[in-house]
C-alpha cells in the first residue's frame, strides 16, 4: 500500500474514533469529507481496508462504526443454521459470528476475530478478519453426479456448503456413493469450495459404510502401520521369571476382573481383604509400559491415537490387539505384569496407608457386571453356587464401595446420573434394540475403586513434587453459574455462590439431590452440566471440581488411554530410582504437549462415539414409522417440545406439528401454552407421541403428539 493510502486510512480512522462521530453510510461520509466523485472508489477501498483490519465495522444498516481493534485468536465452530461461534482459549464465552461476518471461514478453522458488539448481559458478536490455518483438508459426504461434474454433500452439517468436484477428479464415483473429498480450494471470492475424490467408501446402503463414514469424518486412524504391528508381535512374549525379578508377587491373592460381557481389553483387577475394621484394597493395573517403550513406534502411534474409540459395531484400539486383548490384558489364569496401588482404608473411607508397586498378578476369575449383580442383588442360586468361593470378597466389595461413595458425597462430589444407551446390532450392523445401560452394584464397585486409586496416586505424586499428568476439572465460570442461578429461580430453586462469585461442588450436589424425581430433573441436570467446564489433562494440579477433590489423575486404563500410560512411565522411573534432574527436565518439557494433545484426541473420540449413537438411534427408529410411544417431555424451546422415550431416544415435536391450537412458548416457566384452549405442556409431563419422520444426515427424529381418548371424547 502506498503512503498516501495509509495516511488517508489514519485520518478517517481518527475521525471515526472521535467522541462526536455519528455512525454514517459511505455516501454520507463522502459528502461530509467532500470527497470528489472520481475518488469515491478510493474512499471505498480505504473503508474496506479498515473493516478488514477490524478497526471499523459495518452495521446491518450499512453504517460505519468503530470496531474493537483487539485481535483474538480462536477456533471457528459453524452451526447448521448458517451462523457460527469462535472459541477463544482462556475466554469464558464464545463469540457469535453472523453469516455475513465469516469471511470464508469453515468449521474447525483457526481464525482471528475482532469484537464488533459487546452488549451488557448478552453474548459478544464479532467478525472474522483472518483465517490463520485451515482446520480441514478432507471431508466425508454423499456424492451426487451431474453431466460434467459432481458435488459432495458433507455428512457434517457444520460444513455449510457442498463441495464442487470436476468430472475428471471424481475417481469414478456415482450418485449414492459415500466418499472422502480432499479440498483443493476453499471457495474464495464467493465461489463454492472445490475438491477431488480421494476415496470411495462404498454405497450409502452398504453394511458398515455408515460408521466407516463417521470414522473417516473424524479422521480416526484405523489400520496400524506394519512397523507398529511387527513391534507389537516382537514384544508380546509370555511373562518369564526374569520379567518378575524385583516385583511384588501377588499371584496367590484372590483376584478378579469385573467388566462388561463383551470387553476384551481387561486392564484392571481387584483384590480385597479386611483386617479388623480396615480394608486392604488392591487395584492392579496392566503394566503396559513394559511392552511400550518411550518413543518407540508403538509409543508414537499410541500418542497419535490418544485413546481407544468405542463405536457401535467396532473398537478402534489405541494399541494393536496382540497387546490390548493379549499380553496387556489381565486374562484369567495367566501370569501378568502389573502396576498396583494397594490401599489400607478405614471404616470412614479414608486411605490411611498405601503402596504403589510393580507386581505380578494371576487373575482367578473373569467376572462380568451382570454376574456380580446377580450374586449381590438378585441372589441368583446358579451364580452363587458357581462363584461360591468369591462371595465373601464380593460382599466386602459392596460394603467398601458404599463407604467410599458416602465419603465422596459428604465432601460434595457431583454425580450426574444420566441414562446411557446400549445399541444392540445384528450381523449386518443394523440396530435391533436399544437398552438403557444398567448402572448397578457391580458397575458402582469398579467405579468407586478406580476413583480412589486415581486420587491416591495423584496425591502421592503431587506431594513428591514430581512432574505428573493430572485430570483436572476447573471451577465453573462465574457468568455461566450466575445465569444458571437465575434460571433455577424460575423453578423455586436456589444455589449459594460464595461471595456472590464462586460456586462450590456441594451446592451443585444439593441441587441435584433436590431435583431428583421431579419433572424438571432431566433439563436442570443437563443445564447444570453444560454450565461446567470440560475436564482435561494438565501438568498442573488444578483440582477436580466435579469430584470435589484437589488430587485426581487417570491411572487405571493404560491399554486404552495414553495419559494413563504416560504416568505409569513416570511412576516406574520413580520406583526404579531413575527420576534424576535430566528425567525431571524431560517430563517438564513433554507433559504440556502430551496434555493438550490427549485432551483434544479425547474430545474427538467422544464426538465420534456420540455421533454413532445418534445415527444408530435414528436407524432403529426408522422401523417404527407411524407407531405410538409413551414418553416424557425432556425439553421445551420456542420451536417445539423434546420428548424422551424409555429407551433414551429423544425426538422433537415441532411447534408447526402442534395443530390443535396456536402454542406460545412461556420462557419464564419453560412451558408451552395453547392460546385458545390454554392447554399446557410442562417439563417431565408424560405424553403419547407418534413417530412421523427421521433423518440420518441430521440425526434427528420427529414426533407428533397423539390425543388421548379422553381428549377426543371431550372434543367430540
Can you say where each PLM-predicted feature lies in the sequence?
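Charge-lined substrate channels and their catalytic hotspots, especially those that engage the 3′ end
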Residues: 1-282, 289-335, 373-374, 619, ...
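Electropositive polyanion-binding surfaces
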Residues: 31, 185-186, 213-216, 220, ...
Amino acid at each position: 500500500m502506498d503512503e498516501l493510502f495509509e495516511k488517508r486510512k489514519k485520518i478517517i480512522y481518527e475521525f471515526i474514533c472521535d467522541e462526536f462521530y455519528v455512525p454514517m453510510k459511505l455516501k454520507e461520509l463522502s459528502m461530509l469529507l467532500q470527497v470528489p466523485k472520481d475518488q469515491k472508489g478510493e474512499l471505498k477501498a480505504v473503508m474496506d481496508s479498515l473493516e478488514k483490519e477490524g478497526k471499523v465495522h459495518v452495521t446491518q444498516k450499512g453504517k460505519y462504526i468503530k470496531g474493537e481493534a483487539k485481535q483474538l485468536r480462536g477456533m471457528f465452530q459453524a452451526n447448521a443454521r448458517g451462523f457460527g461461534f469462535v472459541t477463544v482459549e482462556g475466554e469464558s464465552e464464545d463469540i457469535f459470528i453472523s453469516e455475513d461476518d465469516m469471511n470464508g471461514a469453515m468449521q474447525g478453522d483457526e481464525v482471528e476475530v475482532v469484537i464488533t458488539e459487546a452488549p451488557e448481559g448478552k453474548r459478544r458478536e464479532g467478525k472474522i478478519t483472518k483465517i490463520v490455518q485451515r482446520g480441514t483438508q478432507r471431508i466425508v459426504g454423499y456424492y451426487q453426479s451431474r453431466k460434467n461434474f459432481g458435488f459432495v454433500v458433507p455428512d457434517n452439517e457444520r460444513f455449510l456448503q457442498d463441495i464442487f468436484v470436476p468430472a475428471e477428479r471424481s475417481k469414478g464415483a456415482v450418485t449414492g456413493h459415500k466418499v472422502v473429498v480432499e479440498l483443493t480450494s476453499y471457495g474464495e471470492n464467493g465461489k463454492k469450495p472445490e475438491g477431488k475424490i480421494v476415496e470411495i467408501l462404498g454405497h450409502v446402503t452398504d453394511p458398515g459404510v455408515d460408521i466407516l463414514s463417521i470414522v473417516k469424518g473424524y479422521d480416526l486412524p484405523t489400520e496400524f502401520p506394519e512397523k507398529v504391528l511387527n513391534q507389537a508381535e516382537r514384544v508380546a512374549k509370555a511373562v518369564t521369571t526374569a520379567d518378575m525379578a524385583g516385583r511384588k508377587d501377588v499371584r496367590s491373592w484372590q483376584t478378579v476382573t469385573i467388566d462388561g460381557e463383551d470387553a476384551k481389553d481387561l486392564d484392571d483387577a481387584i483384590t480385597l481383604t479386611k483386617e479388623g475394621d480396615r480394608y486392604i484394597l488392591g487395584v492392579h493395573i496392566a503394566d503396559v509400559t513394559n511392552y511400550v517403550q518411550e518413543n518407540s513406534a508403538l509409543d508414537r502411534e499410541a500418542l497419535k491415537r490418544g485413546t481407544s474409540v468405542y463405536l457401535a459395531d467396532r473398537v478402534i484400539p489405541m494399541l494393536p490387539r496382540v497387546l490390548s486383548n493379549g499380553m496387556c490384558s489381565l486374562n484369567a489364569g495367566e501370569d501378568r505384569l502389573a502396576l498396583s496401588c494397594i490401599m489400607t482404608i478405614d471404616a470412614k473411607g479414608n486411605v490411611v496407608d498405601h503402596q504403589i508397586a510393580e507386581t505380578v498378578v494371576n487373575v482367578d476369575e473373569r467376572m462380568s457386571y451382570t454376574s456380580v449383580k446377580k450374586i449381590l442383588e438378585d441372589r441368583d442360586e446358579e451364580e452363587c453356587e458357581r462363584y461360591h468361593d468369591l462371595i465373601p470378597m464380593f460382599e466386602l466389595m459392596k460394603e467398601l464401595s458404599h463407604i467410599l461413595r458416602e465419603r465422596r458425597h459428604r465432601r460434595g462430589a457431583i454425580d450426574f446420573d444420566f441414562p446411557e444407551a446400549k445399541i444392540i446390532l445384528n450381523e449386518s450392523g443394523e440396530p435391533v434394540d436399544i437398552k438403557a445401560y444398567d448402572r448397578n452394584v457391580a458397575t458402582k464397585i469398579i467405579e468407586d475403586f478406580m476413583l480412589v486409586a486415581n486420587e491416591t496416586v495423584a496425591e502421592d505424586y503431587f506431594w513428591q513434587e514430581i512432574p505428573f499428568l493430572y485430570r483436572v476439572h476447573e471451577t465453573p465460570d462465574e457468568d455461566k453459574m450466575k445465569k444458571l442461578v437465575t434460571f433455577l429461580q424460575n423453578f423455586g430453586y436456589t444455589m449459594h455462590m460464595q461471595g456472590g462469585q464462586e460456586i462450590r461442588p456441594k451446592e451443585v450436589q444439593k441441587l441435584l439431590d433436590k431435583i431428583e424425581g421431579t419433572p424438571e430433573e432431566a433439563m436442570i441436570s443437563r443445564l447444570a452440566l453444560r454450565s461446567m467446564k470440560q475436564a482435561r489433562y494438565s501438568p498442573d494440579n488444578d483440582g477436580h471440581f466435579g469430584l470435589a477433590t484437589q488430587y485426581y489423575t487417570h491411572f487405571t486404563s493404560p491399554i486404552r488411554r495414553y495419559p494413563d500410560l504416560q504416568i505409569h512411565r513416570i511412576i516406574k522411573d520413580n520406583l526404579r530410582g531413575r527420576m534424576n534432574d535430566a528425567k525431571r527436565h524431560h517430563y517438564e518439557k513433554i507433559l504440556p504437549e502430551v496434555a493438550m494433545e490427549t485432551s483434544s484426541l479425547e474430545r474427538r473420540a467422544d464426538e465420534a462415539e456420540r455421533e454413532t449413537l445418534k445415527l444408530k438411534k435414528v436407524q432403529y427408529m426408522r422401523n417404527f414409522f407411524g407407531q405410538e410411544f409413551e414418553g416424557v417431555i425432556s425439553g421445551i424451546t420456542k420451536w417445539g417440545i423434546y420428548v424422551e422415550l424409555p429407551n433414551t431416544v429423544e425426538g422433537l415435536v415441532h411447534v408447526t406439528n402442534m395443530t390443535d391450537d396456536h402454542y406460545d412458548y412461556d420462557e419464564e416457566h419453560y412451558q408451552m401454552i395453547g392460546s385458545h384452549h390454554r392447554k399446557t405442556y410442562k417439563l417431565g409431563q408424560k405424553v403419547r407421541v407418534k413417530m412421523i419422520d427421521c433423518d440420518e444426515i441430521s440425526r434427528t427424529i420427529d414426533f407428533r403428539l397423539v390425543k388421548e381418548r379422553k381428549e377426543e371424547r371431550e372434543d367430540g
